[in-house]
């Protein structure tokens, strides 16, 4: 299998009191091409920190993040930003859509920032919204959408630039069980259809069991679950 994302001996320490607070300690992980992996761990275990490091939003205290075999350890902030824009998509528990723009515009904007022409960005955005069955709400602002619709638009935005990796932090955690299952099915179907590799943090073990692998955080290490 081809490794897309590798976390190598990752350490993350925070200063606190007389000794540092250790969140991650020589943590290792490989996400292979086309894999859908669940990150299952209790609140406060370090899931968000792990995702932020994997997504180059946060620098580890030590260790390296490898994306498609290339080290990111010594990349400048501008280089890390460019990698995020082109290769990494994010979905959060709360959608973070721009409230003043429509659903369609929210999916177009990151593409235009990346250099796509407006007409191409619009065409790509509509295709994604159609695939996620929310194109009929394309001209509505986020406040006019249901929670499930908001998350589907957020998913479309996350994959709009054609990333190789999708990272999701509790993407269904704020939804009711029925909507949660529907949004997860839409997300997993899109990941598989687009050939993405995804690491998804969730408290929902029933959803986690539907993924290829499951990992957790134990004693500041990444551990495989059955």
From Swiss-Prot:
One of its GO terms (molecular function) is ATP hydrolysis activity. One of its GO terms (cellular component) is plasma membrane. It is found in: Cell inner membrane. Keywords: ATP-binding, Cell inner membrane, Cell membrane, Membrane, Nucleotide-binding, Translocase, Transport. GO terms for biological process: lipoprotein localization to outer membrane; protein localization to outer membrane. ATP binds at residues 41-48. SMART domains: AAA. InterPro entries: AAA+_ATPase, ABC_transporter-like_ATP-bd, ABC_transporter-like_CS, ABC_transpr_LolD-like, MacB-like_ATP-bd, P-loop_NTPase. It is a peripheral membrane protein. It is an enzyme of class 7 (translocase). Residues 5-225 form the ABC transporter domain. Its EC number is 7.6.2.-. Belongs to the ABC transporter superfamily. Lipoprotein translocase (TC 3.A.1.125) family. The complex is composed of two ATP-binding proteins (LolD) and two transmembrane proteins (LolC and LolE). Part of the ABC transporter complex LolCDE involved in the translocation of mature outer membrane-directed lipoproteins, from the inner membrane to the periplasmic chaperone, LolA. Responsible for the formation of the LolA-lipoprotein complex in an ATP-dependent manner. This is Lipoprotein-releasing system ATP-binding protein LolD. The gene is lolD.
């Amino acid at each position: 299998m081809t490794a897309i994302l590798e976390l190598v001996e990752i350490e993350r320490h925070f200063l606190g009191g007389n000794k540092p607070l250790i969140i991650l300690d020589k943590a290792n992980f490989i996400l292979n091409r086309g894999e859908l992996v669940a990150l299952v761990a209790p609140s406060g275990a370090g899931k968000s920190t792990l995702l932020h490091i994997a997504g180059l939003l946060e620098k580890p205290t030590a260790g390296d993040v490898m994306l498609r075999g290339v080290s990111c350890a010594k990349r400048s902030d501008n280089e890390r930003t460019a990698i995020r824009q082109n290769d990494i998509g994010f979905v959060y528990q709360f959608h973070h859509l721009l409230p003043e723009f429509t659903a369609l515009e929210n999916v177009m904007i990151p593409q235009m920032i990346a250099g796509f022409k407006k007409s191409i960005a619009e065409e790509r955005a509509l295709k994604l919204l159609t695939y996620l069955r929310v194109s009929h709400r394309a001209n509505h602002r986020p406040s006019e959408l249901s929670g499930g619709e908001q998350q589907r638009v957020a998913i479309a935005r996350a994959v709009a630039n054609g990333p190789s990796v999708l990272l999701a932090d509790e993407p269904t955690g704020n939804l009711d069980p029925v909507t949660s299952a529907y949004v997860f099915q839409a997300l997993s179907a899109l990941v598989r259809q687009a050939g993405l590799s995804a690491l998804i943090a969730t408290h929902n073990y029933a959803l986690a069991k539907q993924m290829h692998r499951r990992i957790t955080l134990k004693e500041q290490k990444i551990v495989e679950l059955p």
